């Protein structure tokens, strides 16, 4: 299986978990949790969030 990483916090996503979000333009985002998905949609930058930097 291919190893996937969260598009927001960069943590490893175990197979069978997480969420895949595909935009109409073909961009694909992988999220480990709804927390990461919501922060990405709000336009937050993971560099500025302490808990998200720990996964990088």
UniProtKB/Swiss-Prot annotation:
Keywords: Metal-binding, Ribonucleoprotein, Ribosomal protein, RNA-binding, rRNA-binding, Zinc, Zinc-finger. Part of the 50S ribosomal subunit. Forms a cluster with proteins L3 and L14. GO terms for biological process: translation. It comes from the Archaea. InterPro entries: L24e/L24_sf, Ribosomal_eL24-rel_arc, Ribosomal_eL24-rel_N, TRASH_dom. Binds 1 zinc ion per subunit. Belongs to the eukaryotic ribosomal protein eL24 family. Pfam families: Ribosomal_L24e. This is Large ribosomal subunit protein eL24. Zn(2+) binds at residues 6, 9, 32, 36. One of its GO terms (molecular function) is structural constituent of ribosome. Disulfide bonds: none annotated. CDD domains: Ribosomal_L24e_L24. HAMAP family: Ribosomal_eL24. SUPFAM superfamilies: Glucocorticoid receptor-like (DNA-binding domain). Its cofactor is Zn(2+).
């Amino acid at each position: 299986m291919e190893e996937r990483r969260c598009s927001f916090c960069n943590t490893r996503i175990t197979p069978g978990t997480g969420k895949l979000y595909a935009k109409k333009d073909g961009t694909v985002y992988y999220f480990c949790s709804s927390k990461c998905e919501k922060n990405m949609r709000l336009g937050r930058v993971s560099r500025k969030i302490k808990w998200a930097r720990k996964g990088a």
